[in-house]
Regions:
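Short aromatic-cysteine micro-motif
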Residues: 1-53, 57-66, 120
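C-terminal, surface-exposed recognition/capping segments
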Residues: 37-38, 47-51, 57-120
């Protein structure tokens, strides 16, 4: 799934989704935008329910550290690239490969995995 659509990517828009906290701030920033439908990864997470959102780098690294335990419990995370909610300027956003714990800045129109998380 794309972080943003190819059409949105060509506009090189910076959304302000740059928080690395443990909350839905970045997703909330994008949901409030009039062009929110141009951000499929965030929309997909939010469509699960209002409490669901795309995790920050910090939150996704925490998931990475628990990947073996989560997979044993049936969560089925793959050692693939997953989007975080944090952008890196107008054309890139951070993604983490779950076989390592270091984020990389990738073009927003790339297709990566998405893992929604919820507040509790």
């Amino acid at each position: 799934m794309q972080w943003c659509t190819g059409a949105q990517f060509t506009k090189s828009i910076t959304t302000g989704a740059s928080n690395d906290g443990d909350d839905s701030y970045n997703s909330d920033v994008i949901i409030k935008r009039q062009d929110q439908l141009s951000y499929p990864a965030i929309i997909w997470c939010r469509e699960k329910d209002f409490d669901w959102y795309l995790p920050s780098q910090k939150e996704l690294v925490s998931i990475y550290k628990l990947i073996d335990l989560l997979n044993k419990r049936g969560i089925n995370l793959h050692n693939k690239w997953y989007w975080t909610s944090q952008e890196d300027g107008g054309n890139k956003a951070y993604s983490i490969n779950l076989d390592q714990d270091k984020p990389s800045s990738l073009h927003k129109f790339y297709h990566n995995y998405v893992r929604a998380i919820a507040r509790f």
